[in-house]
Amino acid sequence: MQRKNANCRMEKTLVIIKPCALQRALAGEVLSRFEKKGLKIVALKMYRFTKEKCAEHYAHLVGKSFYHIIESSMMAAPVILVALEGIDAVEVVREMTGSTSGRKALSGTVRGDYCMSHQENIIHASDSKENAEKELRRFFDEQDFFEYDTPLFPYLYAEDEI
């Protein structure tokens, strides 16, 4: 189905399924939630953080007393990088992710259902459209993205939304 609406708010956003999720065998469950919601996977790969890439991605936290814990956690095992696409994808994914602290996250969100920690919190999700674009460029090259039609698309949105 072709998009007809010039005002369609189709966006891409980044999700990082963190090492703690992989260690707990939750990666498939986490990814499945986004697919079931109707978000489309347009890029996906496993990745191992380096000190440099961790400092770049978490630049706003470098210098904080807890940064070394984040760095250690993110480098402990591979992560899964996922680019998701959908209308208002950034906001939708953030809502599905839940509060940063697993103890405060609402039941029904990824963090609310799967974690108790503030730092070992299963998933990273871009917090704005601008950051999503920047983060996607940080981890993916243009050729990593795939455009494809899905037969479910007409059932996910009303005709005037697309």
Predicted stretch roles:
Residues 2-162:
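Non-catalytic terminal and connector segments of soluble metabolic enzymes
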